């Protein structure tokens, strides 16, 4: 644990790449006294949204847009999303102003791929978030990963974060499974702690815990227990 290390010289801590689980952030704070400052960016950009020094970090928030980018959250119709509404994170490009520093201009030998992300005077990240009344952003997930069930848009990360709070859960992945009438239903793939045996009662416990800690329609209708969850080479 952290108690075995001298962290007295540690002044700041930041994270990016994957959404930060709030439970992990709180455990880190208790162990070190530091708040992790989460941010958001892509290979195609520099950091776009961040909890900069001076911000009061809000649990689960990736912060506010950095000054160099005109970040806009757009709904499916291309309009600005209202506070609390999920939208795509984009960078507005004003032809009358200098091109945004740090934003790439094109994919190498990828004309069609470039056109897919640059249109309607915006660079489209393909990532979704929502914003609170004070302008703080909260990451939801990739547009392709958002689950559409019975007219609801469900972000996988929120459900994963809740299930990971259960003491007997090691890992969790949330995906959408095709459904004849609902379009998709939520599926939870779960890795349990050693010694914990899968059971129907455990499935019900996980489902009820999600219902109690999120909106009831977000609970996983399918729960599968596995020994491990496959990851890409960069750990995602």
Q: Where are the model-predicted features located?
A:
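Beta-strand->loop->alpha-helix junctions that form or flank phosphate-binding loops
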Residues: 37-44, 48, 63-65, 175-178, ...
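Hydrophobic alpha-helical segments, especially N-terminal targeting/anchoring helices
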Residues: 74-75, 83, 125, 131, ...
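AMP-binding/adenylate-forming catalytic core of the ANL superfamily
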Residues: 95, 113, 128-218, 235
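Short, P/G- and charge-enriched loop/turn segments at secondary-structure junctions
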Residues: 55-61, 116-117
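Glycine-centered tight turns that cap/initiate beta-strands
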Residues: 9, 33, 68, 168-171, ...
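Gly/Ser/Thr-rich phosphate-binding loop
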Residues: 2-58, 70, 77
């Amino acid at each position: 644990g952290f108690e075995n290390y001298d962290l007295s010289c540690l002044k700041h801590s930041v994270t990016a790449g994957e959404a930060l689980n709030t439970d992990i952030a709180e455990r880190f704070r208790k162990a070190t006294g530091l708040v992790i400052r989460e941010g958001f960016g892509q290979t195609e950009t520099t950091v776009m949204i961040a909890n900069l020094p001076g911000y009061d970090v809000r649990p689960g928030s990736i912060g506010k847009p950095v000054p160099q980018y005109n970040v806009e959250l757009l709904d499916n119709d291309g309009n600005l999303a209202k506070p609390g509404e999920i939208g795509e994170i984009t960078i507005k490009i004003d032809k009358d102003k200098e091109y945004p520093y740090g934003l790439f201009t094109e994919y190498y030998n990828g004309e069609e791929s470039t056109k897919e992300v640059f249109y309607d005077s915006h660079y489209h990240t393909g990532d979704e978030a929502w914003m609170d009344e004070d302008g703080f952003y909260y990451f939801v997930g990739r547009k392709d990963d958002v689950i559409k069930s019975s007219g609801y848009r469900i972000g996988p990360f929120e459900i994963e974060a809740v299930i990971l709070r259960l003491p007997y859960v090691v890992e969790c992945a949330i995906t959408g499974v095709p459904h004849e009438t609902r379009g998709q239903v939520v599926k939870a793939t779960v890795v349990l702690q050693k010694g914990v045996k899968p059971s129907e009662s455990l499935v019900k416990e996980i489902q009820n815990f999600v219902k109690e800690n999120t909106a009831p329609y977000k609970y996983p209708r399918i729960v599968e227990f596995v020994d491990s969850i496959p990851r890409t080479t960069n750990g995602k």
